[in-house]
Amino acid sequence: MIDIHTLYGKTPYGQNYLFESVLQGMERFDVDYALISSLKAAYYSGPESEAEVLAVCRKHPRLLPVAGIDLRNNFSPEETVFRLKSAGFVAARFFTEINHISLDTPLFRELAAAAEVLQLPLLADAPAGMVSAALRPMGPLTVPIILLSQNAYDNYDVLGAMRERKNLYLEIRGFNSPDILEYLTAHTGSGRLLFGSRAPMDYLLPTRNIVEYSHLLQEDKERILDKNARQIFLNEKGGCTNAAD
């Protein structure tokens, strides 16, 4: 099992989330790998957080480093993506939900174009209606863009965007309505869905249970919980069947 959405670090409001808590959750719930990013990138400074995240992941190889990018303070997209890819980050993340900024900007599109060249996957929260607006002006892309924190109320925008763009993937954490996972699988294929918990800010188990207690075929569950992420972030084959099959 691979968790594509974990965090650590301090917030300005007094919370302190430890990467040790992520590791403990991985041991408890049999998670093989977890993508992890630093809240310092969201609240303080992305570049300053990069060395810290890489150091944590070197010490704990089952943690895979995700860089945080702040669209308010990033004016060299090509240099940024090249630096992150060269340093060993497996993906880059936009903290749009914390920074209260829109993806519908020329700078995001420039960063996505640079990520396309180097095939650096991108993760981003996108409020309802923003996904299509942000991506519409762009040409065809193949670099994986993973939409975080979506829910059933966003389906009208997200599913439309995913039909148009085969490089879009969806974290399933917010899809806890009855039969919603079966609905998503029917419309996108299980190869476009990924397990992410947002631990330790949120609990890991409820998100895993969304998959485990669904009526999906076992092979679909394995794709969502493990195989899709392995193909995207570890370059392992066996997931990402993009058609609704």
Where is each model-derived feature located?
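Active-site environment of divalent metal-dependent phosphoester hydrolases
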Residues: 9-12, 41-45, 72-75, 99, ...
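A general structural detector for well-ordered alpha-helical segments in enzyme core domains, enriched
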Residues: 21-25, 49-56, 79-84, 107-111, ...
